[in-house]
């Protein structure tokens, strides 16, 4: 085991050692690390759940590893329904991030089950679905009463999801100057152009500066040319 050799050579370890072992599903490594005094924290359970390693999660929890809402959120983000169900049945808490992480991962079935089981959500569910480009998830969330705010448009602009931004605006999602700023900083000129043509407010100086700093010169040039001609 490489970890044994590293420890024999005096290499330090910390909570992250157990977390990484859990993420990789390396139960024997995790067991050896714990038997030899390696610390752990909540991220061991979160990482195991996120990558679907139920046996690792079960061993960790049985042996006293702390867990928090991140365990359910991690399982939801990874779309690991069996892990999520086990975690809930064994006392793991959840919160709004559980729905948000499911939406961000595009896991429609998981999100539906969460809501049917009473898991709370908030505006982050919509913004994370938007960031991931998951239009169907966003549409279902809105149809089911999930709130949204300006972060939904900002997230679509940040990731360049023009079709999703168009749908959000057509359905009343608010936006602010951060929509243009995020489009500019990530080089999504088509998103920026559409947003401005449809009345999105902006700080053109900020957009131009960010684009220049990132070497996105086509965006910077367009902003400079259109700073006056567009409202």
Regions found by a protein language model. Give the residues of each.
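Ankyrin repeat (ANK) tandem alpha-helical domains that serve as protein-protein interaction scaffolds
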Residues: 1-231
């Amino acid at each position: 085991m490489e970890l044994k050799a590293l420890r024999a050579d005096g290499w330090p370890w910390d909570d992250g050692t157990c977390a990484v072992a859990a993420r990789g599903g390396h139960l024997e490594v995790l067991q050896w690390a714990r038997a030899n005094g390696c610390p752990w924290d909540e991220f061991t359970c979160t990482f195991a759940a996120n990558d679907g390693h139920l046996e690792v999660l079960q061993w960790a929890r049985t042996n006293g590893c702390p867990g928090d809402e991140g365990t359910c959120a991690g399982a939801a983000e990874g779309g690991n329904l069996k892990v999520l169900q086990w975690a809930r049945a064994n006392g793991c808490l959840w919160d709004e991030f559980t729905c948000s992480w499911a939406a961000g991962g595009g896991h429609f079935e998981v999100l539906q089950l969460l809501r049917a089981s009473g898991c709370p959500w908030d505006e982050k569910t919509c913004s994370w679905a938007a960031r991931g480009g998951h239009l169907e998830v966003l549409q279902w969330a809105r149809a089911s009463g999930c709130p949204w705010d300006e972060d939904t448009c900002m997230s679509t602009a940040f990731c360049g999801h023009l079709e999703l931004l168009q749908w959000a605006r057509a359905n009343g999602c608010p936006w602010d100057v951060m929509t243009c700023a995020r489009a500019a900083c990530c080089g999504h000129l088509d998103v920026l152009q559409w947003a401005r043509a449809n009345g999105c407010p902006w700080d053109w100086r900020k957009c131009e500066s960010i684009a220049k700093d990132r070497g996105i010169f086509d965006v910077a040039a367009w902003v400079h040319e259109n700073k006056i001609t567009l409202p």
